[in-house]
A protein has these predicted regions:
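A short secondary-structure junction signal
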Residues: 34-35, 62-63, 104-105, 112-116, ...
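Accessory alpha-helical/coil subdomains and C-terminal extensions
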Residues: 121-122, 126
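Short catalytic-loop micro-motif centered on adjacent basic/acidic residues
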Residues: 23-25, 100-105, 127
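Thiamine diphosphate
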Residues: 1-59
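Glycine-rich beta-alpha junction loops
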Residues: 55-57, 108, 131-136
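Conserved thiamine diphosphate
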Residues: 18, 66-119
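Short, hinge-like loop/turn segments at secondary-structure boundaries
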Residues: 41, 66-70, 144-147
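Flexible, low-complexity linker and terminal segments
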Residues: 134-168
Length: 168
């Protein structure tokens, strides 16, 4: 049911409002073929938790570029580089009138747990983007934030009611 996870999760939640629903999609699955479902799940703002695993590539199709691949990205499906700018999942979420978006890096377990707990406690649609590496087809895609040192230098941690701190 490629691309239909958000639609199925929405139906499950509407059919059983007491059910806690978590939906998991990749960046290609969730934002390309499932992009319209992602948009409407956010617009409807039902109590649904969406996890978007973003490795900037279709790993299961062996290296096809995805909606989040950067402009110029060379792959089997774009041998001369992609010509489009990538989707920015947070902008897409908020553009659809979504109320909750959080991002974590797969190598930061405490940060990932924190955003998943926040999503669970949020009433309404919640999107958690988790940046992942694809060691086979897109190795190093999130290097700027994948290591602890990289996160200290390049990541911004946002906490409600607290100041933003840039850099170390």
């Amino acid at each position: 049911i490629h691309g239909r996870a958000a639609a199925i999760a929405t139906g499950a939640k509407i059919a059983n409002p007491n059910l806690t629903v978590w939906q998991v999609s990749g960046d290609g699955d969730g934002l390309a073929i499932g992009g319209n479902h992602f948009i409407h799940a956010n617009r409807r703002n039902i109590n649904l938790n969406m996890i978007l695993l973003n490795n900037r590539i279709y790993g299961l199709t062996k290296g096809q570029y995805s909606p989040t691949s950067p402009r110029g990205f060379v792959s089997k499906s774009s041998p001369y580089g992609t010509v489009e700018d990538p989707f920015r999942p947070a902008e897409l979420c908020f553009g659809a009138r979504g109320h909750f978006f959080a991002r974590a890096v797969a190598t930061d377990a405490p940060g990932t747990v924190e955003i998943l707990k926040a999503a669970y406690n949020h009433k309404g649609a919640a999107v958690c983007e988790i940046l992942q590496n694809c060691v086979i087809f897109n190795n190093g895609t999130h290097d700027a934030v994948y290591s602890k040192e990289g996160r200290a230098k390049n990541a911004i941690y946002v906490e409600h009611g607290k100041p933003l701190i840039f850099g170390e």
